[in-house]
Amino acid sequence: MQAARGGAGRPERPGRPGRGPERERERPPGAGAASPCAAPGLPAGGATIHPGSPSAWPPRARAALRLWLGCVCFALVQADSPSAPVNVTVRHLKANSAVVSWDVLEDEVVIGFAISQQKKDVRMLRFIQEVNTTTRSCALWDLEEDTEYIVHVQAISIQGQSPASEPVLFKTPREAEKMASKNKDEVTMKEMGRNQQLRTGEVLIIVVVLFMWAGVIALFCRQYDIIKDNEPNNNKEKTKSASETSTPEHQGGGLLRSKI
């Protein structure tokens, strides 16, 4: 009855199979009716899957591809990023503050620096960013006395940040030790000042004594010259007086002669 009913209503066209239970069984389970607007060769969802596209690869192959692309991008970023700062040192170390300084390579073009500070064996991190191309130092404040800290420095450019520098470990002194060293320095400076004053006084005394001796010697030489110049005159006067006493004159103007 079904065959006769289907054949009597519509004659089958040549080259077009009839639609029957056998045709419905050929469709995969779960596939809906194809849209009349769908392009030929597309599945019912409208997405085209090529055999060579990554979406058709196994999950492990796609994960390996993502990992490789990530490594390539990271390598490109690292190639463009600046080098890590060098010669990182900590100076002006006090109980609650310090100053970290560094250098960069001459060919590097940076727009700022990032300083990370943390306590040793503690995960808490302090991040300081300095947007200044000329600065090569940064002050660390609010430090705890007698505590160890670790400092890293990074250079910042347009391409990104550089790798972190070599870690620098330093320890803040105690306040009592700082005061003791300060008092010791003050005592040393006072002693040096006193010694300097004593040395200055001794030098002044020596100079005054030398000037006095020079004056005495000059006065003695002057007096000696005067005495030496007066000696011939004294000799002449003595000779003249001696001659006058040995040859007395006569009252009449003649010399007295002794009688034999």
From Swiss-Prot:
Modified how: The extracellular domain is cleaved and released from the cell membrane. N-Glycosylated.
Glycosylation sites noted in the Swiss-Prot or TrEMBL record: N87, N132
Biased composition (Low complexity): 29-56
Entries under PROSITE patterns matching the protein: FN3
Chain location of the short sequence motif Microbody targeting signal per the record: 258-260
Region (Disordered): 1-56, 230-260
GO process annotations (BP): positive regulation of brown fat cell differentiation; response to muscle activity
Domain Fibronectin type-III: 84-175
Record's compositionally biased regions (Basic and acidic residues): 10-28, 230-241
Parts of the chain that traverse the membrane: 201-221
Leader sequence segment: none
Expression induction or repression: Up-regulated twofold by muscular exercise at the mRNA and protein level; this effect has been suggested to be mediated by PPARGC1A. However, up-regulation at the mRNA level upon exercise could not be reproduced in another study.
Cellular component terms per the entry's GO annotation: endoplasmic reticulum; extracellular region; peroxisomal membrane; plasma membrane
Tissue expr: Widely expressed, with highest levels in heart. Very low expression, if any, in colon, pancreas and spleen.
Keyword hit for Membrane: yes
Site (Required for dimerization): R126
Gly residues: compositionally biased ranges: 251-260
Keywords: Cell membrane, Glycoprotein, Hormone, Membrane, Peroxisome, Secreted, Transmembrane, Transmembrane helix
Any single Pfam family the record assigns to this protein: fn3
Record-linked InterPro entries: FN3_dom, FN3_sf, FNDC_type_III_4/5, Ig-like_fold
Coiled-coil segments: none
Domain notes from UniProt: Fibronectin type-III domain is capable of forming a continuous intersubunit beta-sheet dimer; dimerization may thereby play a role in cell-cell adhesion or signaling.
The protein, known as: Fibronectin type III domain-containing protein 5
Annotated organism of origin: Homo sapiens (Human)
Lineage: Eukaryota, Metazoa, Chordata, Craniata, Vertebrata
